[in-house]
């Protein structure tokens, strides 16, 4: 093949697509503003470098609504290192920097979500993939912005639900990942108006699981589970410029632990579906997991598991000579997960 082929990824004469050009311009302008380079200096530029200070607040701005979050990471632009085809001279592989792209944003947030964020997550679980614009904001103790990362056309890639554990005293947080088409780092823009409603902390021990026909009263632990988005890259303009197009959702298995003495209904289900081969849709079940307030009387969030099917049942390992409650682990496949807000 001719080494001067215009489609060669390392060709210096290759013209970037319009999307890539705008992305580069956005990265450069935003970076200049953020780090106080000439002609882009702002009063908050120096403070922007302190966004990782201990005790600073992290927030998500979504359609004008400012949402406090526990933590946020990623999103800053980076480039891949591209290897050129081997050449006899010089005797080592040449490398160059590829086009910039934005990293995924990873965010820990409260399971009891404000309206804008709840709708985004709910739509994603219903396979209604909506792209959002917004910003990730870092402030100091007084809610003065230290930095702002503006994102465009972001789509959710993962929704991670925390584990539920009766013996735990720790709070649980939802983990969200979303992929922006491009991001722009900016300096802070002043003081953030703090949300009027406070975020509700949810302890991991406050939950209620219900599966019709099964005794779930002694379920001591539900393992964390994550819904993942599959993507199909779509070329825009030149072959170097790709946009992620949402494909299908990958729903996880549901795994839980309960006392052996209360596992009889689960084992009967396991016998029917697995040992006797009654594995049709008529043997599947629907389950609900309710996240409860501190009084254990008000539902804050309901997670529904559709088309559950048991495929594994077995005792947990117990060390010899220990006086512990014997427990079993149960695993079920799940075809769809949805969420709905409670009344709390």
Label every PLM stretch briefly.
Residues 1-20, 29, 35, 40-46:
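N-terminal secretory signal peptides
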Residues 31, 38-39, 124, 273:
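Flexible domain-boundary/linker segments
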Residues 48-344:
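Glycine-rich, low-complexity intrinsically disordered segments
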């Amino acid at each position: 093949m001719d080494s001067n082929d215009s489609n060669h990824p390392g060709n210096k004469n290759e013209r970037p697509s319009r999307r890539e050009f705008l992305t580069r311009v956005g990265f450069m302008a935003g970076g200049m503003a953020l780090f106080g380079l000439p002609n882009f200096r702002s009063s908050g530029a120096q403070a922007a470098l302190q966004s990782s200070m201990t005790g600073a607040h992290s927030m998500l701005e979504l359609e004008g609504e400012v949402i406090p979050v526990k933590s946020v990471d990623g999103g800053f632009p980076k480039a891949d290192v591209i290897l050129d085809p081997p050449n006899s001279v010089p005797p080592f592989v040449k490398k160059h920097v590829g086009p910039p792209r934005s990293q995924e944003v990873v965010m820990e947030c409260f399971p009891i979500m404000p309206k804008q964020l709840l709708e985004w997550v709910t739509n994603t679980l219903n396979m209604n993939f909506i792209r959002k614009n917004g910003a990730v904001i870092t402030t100091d103790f007084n809610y003065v912005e230290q930095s702002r990362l503006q994102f465009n056309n972001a789509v959710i890639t993962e929704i991670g639900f925390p584990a539920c554990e009766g013996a735990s005293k720790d709070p649980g947080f939802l983990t969200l990942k979303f992929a922006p088409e491009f991001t722009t780092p900016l300096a802070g823009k002043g003081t953030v108006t703090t949300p009027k409603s406070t975020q509700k902390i949810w302890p991991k021990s406050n939950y209620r699981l219900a599966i019709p026909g099964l005794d779930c009263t002694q379920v001591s632990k539900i393992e964390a589970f994550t819904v993942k988005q599959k993507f199909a890259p779509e070329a825009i303009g030149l072959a170097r410029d790709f946009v992620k197009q949402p494909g299908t959702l990958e729903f996880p298995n549901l795994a839980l632990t309960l006392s052996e003495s209360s596992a009889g209904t689960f084992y009967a289900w396991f016998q029917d579906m697995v040992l006797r081969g009654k594995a049709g849709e008529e043997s599947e079940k629907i389950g609900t997991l309710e996240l409860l307030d501190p009084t254990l009387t008000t539902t804050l969030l309901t997670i529904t598991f559709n088309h559950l099917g048991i495929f594994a049942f077995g005792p947990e390992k117990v060390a010899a000579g220990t006086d512990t409650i014997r427990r079993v682990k149960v695993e079920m496949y799940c075809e769809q997960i949805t969420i709905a807000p409670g009344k709390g």
